[in-house]
Design a protein with these regions (language model features):
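Bacterial N-terminal signal peptides that target proteins for export
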Residues: 2-10
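Bacterial N-terminal signal peptides
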Residues: 9-17
Length: 228
């Protein structure tokens, strides 16, 4: 029942992402872009060096980082669980995107930026360029918006899921569960072809209409107890 409610919530957020912005929202967004890169939160998760900051918003218990240019991943890194008792990268990246015709092709970073309330990144391969934006829509969910300069099919997958995490596919959502009770959901629109592959997933978007919207959520099963 809980996951059914979460899927309904994520679909609602995806629909909101597709809808046009109001004039007030547009004004706020324009102001946001006057404060580019006031923080450097570039970090690709590994065991060699520490992370010193995450992008988080709306009172969320999860955070994301921009990938480092020298260790590029074509997706925002995370989510990272900010649980005060058990901090962990739930994935190096829960949603990595590529062109479906050549998923092994290397993407070259063009631009990354932290804005107040938004992460931005763009990269290119020989097949075209892909831009991505990430904004929190609530304490538990962030909306990922993807655009490309070509109508070629896109393919999503996860990169390096965290220790002890089990991945499954339920309807239009990817469910990544940790034994602690923390669960990551990656929710796609109904037209996406979603499949489970080993302990991971693939999501194929055919002839995409941009922007492509994906909801990333981190649910804490014990959250009411922690916050009481």
């Amino acid at each position: 029942m809980k996951y059914k409610f979460i899927r309904i919530l994520c679909f609602t957020l995806l629909a909101a992402g597709i809808a046009a912005c109001t004039p007030g929202m547009k004004s706020t967004t324009e102001k946001r872009y006057t404060f580019a890169d006031i923080l450097d939160i570039s970090y690709t998760p590994d065991t060699l060096h520490r992370c010193y900051g995450w992008f988080t918003d709306a009172g969320s218990w999860m955070g994301f980082t921009l990938p480092e240019r020298q260790q590029w991943v074509n997706g925002f890194c995370g989510p990272f669980s900010l649980d005060m008792f058990r901090r962990q990268w739930m994935a190096q990246s829960a949603a990595v995107v590529s062109f479906a015709k050549d998923t092994q092709e290397i993407f070259v970073p063009d631009s990354t930026c932290y804005y107040p309330g938004e992460l931005y990144m763009s990269a290119h391969s020989t097949h075209g360029s892909i831009t991505q934006r990430l904004n929190f829509t609530s304490a538990s969910t962030a909306l990922l918006r993807i655009e490309a300069d070509t109508a070629e099919d896109l393919l999503f997958s996860g990169s390096q899921w965290g220790k002890d995490i089990t991945v499954s596919v339920e309807q239009n959502s990817v469910i990544a569960r940790h034994p602690s009770g923390e669960t990551v959901t990656v929710t796609f629109t109904p037209n996406v072809e979603l499949a489970k592959t080993d302990n991971n997933y693939t999501a194929l978007v055919r002839s995409p209409r941009y922007p492509v919207n994906v909801a990333l959520s981190l649910i804490h099963i014990s959250e009411p107890t922690r916050r009481s």
